[in-house]
Amino acid sequence: MIRYTVAGHSRRCVVGASKRVGAIKCITVAATKRFISNKPNEVFTKLTNDNDPKRDAFFKYTWGSWLKNDKQEKEKRFTKFSIEGLNRILNDIYIQSNEMAKAPDGKILPPVFNKNLTVSLVNNVVPKNIGKINPNEKVQVTTLSSIHEGKHHRIYKVDTNLNKAFILRIPYPLENENTLSYRIRSEVATMDFADLKLGIKVPKIFCYGVNSLNPVRQPFVLQEFIEGELLMKDWDPLIEDGSSNQKKYDNVIKQVSDFQSKLVSLKLNAFGSIYFNNDLKDGNEKEFVKEDIYDGETNPDLQNRWKIGPSVERCLWRHKSHLDFHKQMKPFLGPWSKKSPMDIIKNTGLLEAENAKTRIAMKEAGSSAELMYPRTLKEQITTYENLAKIAPDLFNVKTKAIPNMQELLSPRLFHPDLDPMNIIVNKEAQEAYLLDFEGACTKPFILQNSPQFIAYDGPKIYDLKEDITDFDKLSEAEKVQYQFMYKRTRNQHQWEKKLNDNNPKLITAVAPPVKLLRSPYIAAVERKTEEEYLLIDESLLQLKEVWDIFAQNDLVNQKKFPLNYSKEDIERHVEDLQKLHEKLISTPFAATQGWIPQDMFDQLLNSGSIVKQENGDYTVKQPEATK
């Protein structure tokens, strides 16, 4: 018998193994931090009964609710998989671990493509990582615990009779299998590269499958379980200067910066994303750069282990399942020559414009049910075509005005989720591990945006007393506002100071003119909603105002701003941007696209602050105006 557990926000769930052979125990608790002390609900199910309806609660999304289309959004995140199939895969890798025990010490073998349509990273599948059982005994899953329901994945902890725990990552089926296949293949290869070549501590991956044809019946990654605490536990962005927790604050900045330093330490030979070289046997060789991923490798086991292929950066794949992959997407995904760094920006713009055009065509043909105003899509086309048009001129790649320009343009590994929430410090050795590499790609450091946990685009305040006139005479409310700006400025400054300590040749990437030049591209990469194309326009219009100065200083390629905006264009943009800001301010939970953490949602619903409508949507009850 196996037992499985649905834990809440808790990163760790410790439960005893069931002694009832052939069944699994399921434990479900509330999905929030404040409720993790609640006694979990336990359900037993037979290992061989994949159709047991009692399992469904284990696979359902529970960490939040949506104000609109709640049922549909949760159904998109239903992660049912075959527990029996998982058990078979664990037995397979256990057999492989015994075979690997005979391999020469230090030998790094290539990934093995198994007959069951999974891939094993056999260099990680060794007895010390997998564990041991008695002779003639079979590997048995004893407990399954759902420990995290993130934006893109459901994370399960798998306890076994090997005296080892594993992590099973199941991506939500938010996109088609082709998208998930590229994403998983690249992420696994990138983590392997980070481990073996860059010396970054990552959870060891043992096995993965890129579609639902494997025994798990879902795309999956099976990897090492790291016992520990998230680095986020020590991060307080609003800490007072000189606080007793200053050392923790400084350590978080240091740990994340050290990871970044290792990620960008090696100059690569193309822009795109990393894959295993033996992925070539099942793919189109034109997808991959033929030359070595980097120069100077002397270890024969690492030579030709990886290749650069199409970029899996999220913005290039998000909401594009309706496009013809080979005709409408592939031409814009790279890989790109290291001689053409601005092609990344150009192709991002062209792909998004193609996406908007296709959506308009589908809507006009009556084959799309999405509720989107045609004007918004038409405006997106104009915006993204402008981004593609200006891309070759955004940076003068031969300028001497920006120190170390060629260093800034070289392909380097970029991690999109470099964040203390994505770093775990293991319990025993207190070593930091970088967890999730989804969407990692190689691109110039000059186009890499700052980590979100320290990013700040507001007014900069470096000293409250010097920068703010009569600060001491302000009201408490005004002081709090300025203190917030100061602390956000301080956080970003501390991050950039650490970047200068670790990588002084790259520090000019955070110079204000350079940030402004890349801002249209960053706005495109970070766009979350349909209306946020306006933020790209805003960045382009800001560039228009200073373009002459940049041209005089040899920062850009063209003396004249490459785009044309009429007075009416600018007035319409100002009006639309104002409406967007008003919408963000007036619409509850607009920043999370209507998603609410489940404990907060339950409290608001029970108090009457949220009201369910007849169509299943929810509205936030506005407070009555005082007389």
Swiss-Prot record:
Recorded family membership: Belongs to the AIM9 family.
Main location: mitochondrion
GO cellular component terms given for this protein: mitochondrion
Keyword Transferase on entry: no
Stated name of the protein: Altered inheritance of mitochondria protein 9, mitochondrial
Subcellular location: Mitochondrion
Presequence range in chain numbering: 1-43
InterPro entries, A to Z: Kinase-like_dom_sf, Mito_inheritance_9
Superkingdom: Eukaryota
Keywords from the named record: Mitochondrion, Transit peptide
SUPFAM superfamilies reported for this sequence: Protein kinase-like (PK-like)
Organism: Saccharomyces cerevisiae (strain RM11-1a)
